[in-house]
Amino acid sequence: MRHQCRVPQLGRPADQRKAMLRGLTTQLIREGRVTTTKARAKALRDEAERMITLAKEGSLASRRRVLGYVYDKQLVHALFEKAPDRYSDRKGGYTRITRTVRRRGDNAEMAIIELV
């Protein structure tokens, strides 16, 4: 039995789920907003907020952790330059999830997740 499961499964094996969340996190940091399903957006929120919090710390260890997660090295350097200035007054809540219309093919709940 899986009591108090904390990780959303998203209908995928663990390796595929981690790769998908890494890709979505990279895209969110690069573009500033991503349109995806509501469940994926909620799972992405945790990862993106963790990366921004690490970028606010600015230490070498946190930079290496983000480099190991985000796919684009130049994007990590840009994140570490702008995140402390952009989010200095916030202690969390760096993203916003807005619900949109359902997807036409399978009627899945869609959402836009964007950086505040």
From Swiss-Prot:
The keyword Ribonucleoprotein applies. The keyword Ribosomal protein applies. GO terms for molecular function: structural constituent of ribosome. One of its GO terms (cellular component) is cytosolic large ribosomal subunit. Keywords: Ribonucleoprotein, Ribosomal protein. InterPro entries: Ribosomal_bL17 (IPR000456), Ribosomal_bL17_sf (IPR036373). GO terms for biological process: translation. Gene3D superfamilies: Ribosomal protein L17. Part of the 50S ribosomal subunit. Contacts protein L32. HAMAP family: Ribosomal_bL17. PANTHER family: LARGE RIBOSOMAL SUBUNIT PROTEIN BL17M (PTHR14413:SF16), RIBOSOMAL PROTEIN L17 (PTHR14413). Belongs to the bacterial ribosomal protein bL17 family. This is Large ribosomal subunit protein bL17. It comes from Synechococcus sp. (strain WH7803).
